[in-house]
Amino acid sequence: MFAARFDPTKVTENVLTAEVTQIKEPTVPQKRKRDAETDDEGSGEDDASSSEDDASSSEDDSDTISEQDENKVASVAPTETSQQSVDAKHSSVLNRFQQTLSLQGALSASDKVSSDNDVHDEDVSMKDVHSLTPIPQPAKVTNEALKLLDPSTYKSTAWDAATKIHYDSKMVKQFDSYEGELDARLLKNITSNFSSETFPIQTILFDKVLPLLNSSFKANRKLFTRRVGDILVNASTGSGKTLAYSVPLVQILRSRTVNKVRAIILVPTKILIHQVYDCLSKLSQGTSLNVSMSKLENSLKEEHNKFLYNSPDILIITPGRLVDHLQMESFDLKTLKFLVLDEADRLLNQSFQNWNQVLFHHLTNDKQDKRPGNVIKMVFSATLTTNAEKLYNLYLHNPKIFLTDSVKLYSIPKKLQELNVNIPTAKSLFKPLLLLRIIHDIKSSASRNAKILVFVKSNEASIRLESLLHAMLGSGIIEDEYNMFLSSIHSNISKGSSRKLIQEFASSEQKKSVLISTDIMARGIDINEITHVINYDLPISSQQYVHRCGRTARANTEGIAINLLVGKGEQKFWSQHIDTDLSRDIDGYQPSAYLDEEKLSELFSIEDTLKDTYKGCIKQLQTSKEADSK
């Protein structure tokens, strides 16, 4: 009753038995076999389309395939009759298939899409793809005149808006020549406590500022600050900056009648407070000026009551402490005439309690005259020229900047001798031993003992180096050198201990005194007796180098700075990043080698027995450190 369904598996079995092994023919349903038997053109077109990928087939192969098709159709003849009803249902699908085949035959060769054309299209599309390279930039517009200058000179262009006044190291005068500008008692205090000759920065300041300051103060005591303007001073360390700003303060304020805060001197550290206080105390002898200092060792409440009862004329203070007193209203700023920033670069880098904003907020609220220039701001630093952008918050009025007559950033004292020790990388292990040998070679003169300040990079390095030097001296690795003052100072010890160590170092009567320090000693410590500075670890910038070396060759005395440079890397860093920023006097010293080649080879020559002793000292320190940790 019903026709048998078409079974493709039977057709596949019959096809596989008759298939030639050379050509593999896919299984085709019966309806397609019937069409292939009755329609030779359709079969030819179908064969042509099925063999499209094999263009090298011959006509003989085509005949063989057609004969095989006929054999396959004959083998499935009984099944064909049973599938006629099924074929009728799929006639529409078969018609569409035949139409597709006929359309493919009618296509022209140019319309057919081949794999070669696809590759060609891909090649064309890739022509506009660029590699990941930077976008071309327009050429820079440069000033041809600047090409003739050294690149380091460009750093000095930040002060174009200020009135620049240059000075050189030869500007030295007798203090007696300022007899008409300075009070007689003040002049006597200067010559008896300090010097009879001025330093260059003092000379230029007294020549340019004192006459204007005196005349403006006589004309109008309330508004003289606006006529004078603000003063910015770029001077090397140890050039007499403290005396340079202290003398004008005492000269103007000596005749005041009522105690009011008229001058505030901001310093970055408590150690500097004592130095400035000593200077002003000596200058103000014989006057009624009240010079006070505020420091953390004192109770804030006691200082508050003290300032309320007896207001100072000149106050020396750190930024954080100043904010505390302003918030407690220990004093007001109505009568403030001078604001001095000593070591300004470090002050401007500090943000303790936002001291800058708090100070100028109170200054604006307390002052009746709120126009610019109501306070003379005196900014002093050895590295001032790098901080032009930070001075914006000081609200400068008609500023005058005093610069050394040099295109370099920083100036080195004329009598400072710089010596470089180029240590090979292979000898870096014995760097502490080489340091001890260099200290041993330093000779003390008959006039003064050798006081050596050694700078290291960290607190741990300071402690470790001191212990190792003590161990080497105790082992007799260097003869006749055990009897010397040797200590270290760092931020891990208390302020009282630090001050005591500094006093012991300064007053030591031994022929050699060595103090190992971090950069805490690099600023503002006024010890004129330091003969040598050794940079055991190279500073990170030319600015830090200037402050370190400024501990010696102070007050026009001789000084020596020895730099230990390990390997070519540190030697290159010193020459390219430190030395290029430094200006030296033509008549002064220039950097040179510590020793000639023959003596330098003797310095680096270390015997095996000495190596064993040195390594034994290191092992001893390691053992003691492990024992302390337990």
UniProtKB/Swiss-Prot annotation:
GO terms for molecular function: ATP binding; ATP hydrolysis activity; RNA binding; RNA helicase activity. Residues 434-601 form the Helicase C-terminal domain. Pfam families: DEAD, Helicase_C. A motif (DEAD box) lies at residues 342-345. The Q motif is unique to and characteristic of the DEAD box family of RNA helicases and controls ATP binding and hydrolysis. One of its GO terms (cellular component) is nucleolus. SUPFAM superfamilies: P-loop containing nucleoside triphosphate hydrolases. PROSITE patterns: DEAD_ATP_HELICASE, HELICASE_ATP_BIND_1, HELICASE_CTER. Its main location: nucleus. It is found in: Nucleus, Nucleolus. InterPro entries: DEAD/DEAH_box_helicase_dom, Helicase_ATP-bd, Helicase_C-like, P-loop_NTPase, RNA-helicase_DEAD-box_CS. The lineage of its organism: Eukaryota, Fungi, Dikarya, Ascomycota, Saccharomycotina. Residues 78-91 have a biased composition (Polar residues). ATP-binding RNA helicase involved in the biogenesis of 60S ribosomal subunits and is required for the normal formation of 25S and 5.8S rRNAs. It catalyses: ATP + H2O = ADP + phosphate + H(+). A motif (Q motif) lies at residues 198-206. The keyword Hydrolase applies. The gene is DBP6. The keyword Cell inner membrane does not apply. Gene3D superfamilies: P-loop containing nucleotide triphosphate hydrolases. It is an enzyme of class 3 (hydrolase). Residues 37-68 have a biased composition (Acidic residues). Residues 222-402 form the Helicase ATP-binding domain. It comes from the Eukaryota. ATP binds at A235, S236, T237, G238, S239, G240, K241, T242. Residues 1-91 are annotated as: Disordered. Associated with pre-ribosomal particles. This is ATP-dependent RNA helicase DBP6.
